[in-house]
Amino acid sequence: MPFGKPLVGTLLASLTLLGLATAHAKDDMKAAEQYQGAASAVDPAHVVRTNGAPDMSESEFNEAKQIYFQRCAGCHGVLRKGATGKPLTPDITQQRGQQYLEALITYGTPLGMPNWGSSGELSKEQITLMAKYIQHTPPQPPEWGMPEMRESWKVLVKPEDRPKKQLNDLDLPNLFSVTLRDAGQIALVDGDSKKIVKVIDTGYAVHISRMSASGRYLLVIGRDARIDMIDLWAKEPTKVAEIKIGIEARSVESSKFKGYEDRYTIAGAYWPPQFAIMDGETLEPKQIVSTRGMTVDTQTYHPEPRVAAIIASHEHPEFIVNVKETGKVLLVNYKDIDNLTVTSIGAAPFLHDGGWDSSHRYFMTAANNSNKVAVIDSKDRRLSALVDVGKTPHPGRGANFVHPKYGPVWSTSHLGDGSISLIGTDPKNHPQYAWKKVAELQGQGGGSLFIKTHPKSSHLYVDTTFNPDARISQSVAVFDLKNLDAKYQVLPIAEWADLGEGAKRVVQPEYNKRGDEVWFSVWNGKNDSSALVVVDDKTLKLKAVVKDPRLITPTGKFNVYNTQHDVY
């Protein structure tokens, strides 16, 4: 990464003092930063000025505040205490000074902070503003409690006015919910005809879609913490309720334990750091629980421990909640929400995403900045193991398959390197391999967000969405599960889409219900053409390209059946 000649010595020396410059693989770490640095929906309400910081007009402060929450908050945190990125509090930034900070923002760091200036993403004037801004005390966004939730809550169609049976002719189990990130929408796509059924307005940049246990209700949550509940039984799939559970969020889930199907919905917020339990038919808020508290490693207080992945237990009437910065997994029992019980399991800091092993008993969850996978036994309600894996694991839900030697394994790819880690998951029949990294495959490179296979498939797909090499980010690696010693095959997904100019990042393999097709998003800029590409899983040949002007920045895709039944 180039540095301006007059600043080379000063900048590198300062970076060393800050502990930011190491000899890590720059491209792979840049991929991780690019992912974590996604725009935040947080908008603090007032201007803060700090002794010792450069003067800023109100308009300058507000402009810089907006840039920070679009570009920086995902890594450095809302309160700038540090998360994936380093702390940027005034005691540190004022000591470094304006010139150093401008150089840092312009050229980035060898550890992976993006080069906002030399890449052209921020102007010189914007960089000057940002260097001033981070020398001020961070403005704290407002809290979001029950009054705010209830004010945002809307029941658009009352439960008693909803249909008693499915009124449309859609093959619901093979329907896909596709995130249209920058449009603030989802597209419902028929998996058989490959046509868009309906585009529905949602919150900003939907992060995930989840199905209720019955398969009737689709729940989507935007990064602005807005949840939309969509009734798939209606004559035309229709939004029936919505609520905002905070200011920024990533996760939503529905109760799945026998006897409690569809009864409750839970969602977790990045800000304020909390989760909320709601009525499963109306989204009426019932309970809010803060996640602020002590970290699992140093037992120090953290003011901003964000809620990441949430998964519904099949063993108990519980939600399993990842708390990112504290490194704790919470078992939230919803048997009696008026007397809510929460069990805290210490795991490792920076818990993020994960999914079930093939038995649906063990929750395999990545602590991405700790380079570990935590194994949570949902039946015995305890930590079974912490497994060391590669750099910055990001499994999505992960991928389960049967290895010829090690038996059932769960696998994850990584943002920070090109490895794929395989972890044994069968303590009964293969105890010598259980909860150990039994093998490691090598893919195209770092920058992976998702890995996927299917019980009926003999292939394993690995994307590399945030790899800085366009040839890699625009393609996927496919491993033959019957011959893992063979080199992976590369599928030129973006080339098959034939879109012309643009980044054309390929993201998230997703199977159809039958497990014989794999769908990919070709994610282009908001003003460019994007597409969905469908691959025949048996032949690895192109089967279809879905193009439509309404497919604006498609990213995540969620097949109704596979999401409902945790098939991955």
From Swiss-Prot:
| Disulphide linkage map | none
Q: What is its main location?
A: periplasm
One Gene Ontology molecular-function label: metal ion binding
Question: Residue span of the signal peptide, if any?
Answer: 1-25
**Boundaries of each Cytochrome c domain copy?**
55-140
> What are the UniProt keywords, alphabetically?
Electron transport, Heme, Iron, Metal-binding, Oxidoreductase, Periplasm, Signal, Transport
Query: Which residues lie within the region annotated N-terminal tail?
Result: 26-54
**Is Translocase set as a keyword in this record?**
no
Report TM segments: none
Cofactors demanded by this protein:
heme c; heme
Q: Name the top EC class.
A: oxidoreductase
The EC code for this enzyme is 1.7.2.1, 1.7.99.1
The domain of life is Bacteria
Cellular localisation: Periplasm
InterPro entries, from UniProt?
Cyt_c-like_dom, Cyt_c-like_dom_sf, Cyt_cd1_C_sf, Haem_d1_sf, Host-pathogen_enzymatic-act
UniProt binding sites for heme c? 72, 75-76, 96, 109, 113
Q: Where is this region: D1-heme domain?
A: 141-568
Q: Which reaction does it catalyse?
A: nitric oxide + Fe(III)-[cytochrome c] + H2O = Fe(II)-[cytochrome c] + nitrite + 2 H(+); A + NH4(+) + H2O = hydroxylamine + AH2 + H(+)
GO CC terms, sorted? periplasmic space
Annotated heme d1 binding sites: 207, 250-251, 270, 397, 508
What note does UniProt attach to the cofactor annotation?
Binds 1 heme c group covalently per subunit.
Entries under PANTHER family matching the protein: DIHYDRO-HEME D1 DEHYDROGENASE, PROTEIN NIRF
Q: How does it assemble?
A: Homodimer.
Instruction: Specify the protein name.
Output: Nitrite reductase
User: What's the name of its gene?
Assistant: nirS
